[in-house]
């Protein structure tokens, strides 16, 4: 890293640490949305990203008509057709209760990919919880803050054609469960 590179994000490096879990959650949601869901792109010009933290900007209705508010929502316009949704958790949000009350309804939304972002070190616990509740997660991601900003790691990949051809024991090892 050169000195020029090191100082380009000095404002980011000097941001004060969050003072509460809520402040950390809000900051993480905003940073993850910018890092991973920055739509529209040239390839997906109709996609738009909405962040529902700290205030709800685009609620999502489930099949029963109940409103849910995922942290991050990506829709295809016109028509606001739901494509992706993401839930960002802090360490205290990786629990059975949270999974039952929040993750299960999000994973049941039709025709949408559900991504779950948990802090580094909580990926295994999140996968075990999701397996116990039969939650279909399209992608597990871990996040943490480093001096340069947020770092996001993919800890699973969506099932593909090759996955179906693998023996069950190999699929289980790849999922980390």
Segment roles from a protein language model:
Residues 70-102, 114:
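Conserved catalytic cores of phosphodiester-cleaving nucleases, focusing on short active-site segments
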Residues 95-133:
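Short, charged, amphipathic alpha-helix that recurs within catalytic cores of restriction-modification
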Residues 37-44, 79, 108-115, 133-140:
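Structural alpha-beta junctions
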Residues 2-26, 39-85:
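Active-site metal-binding core of divalent-cation-utilizing nuclease and nuclease-like domains
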Residues 120-176:
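Domain-level recognition of nuclease-like catalytic cores that cleave nucleotide substrates
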Residues 3, 100-112, 165-177:
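A short, terminal or domain-edge coil/loop segment
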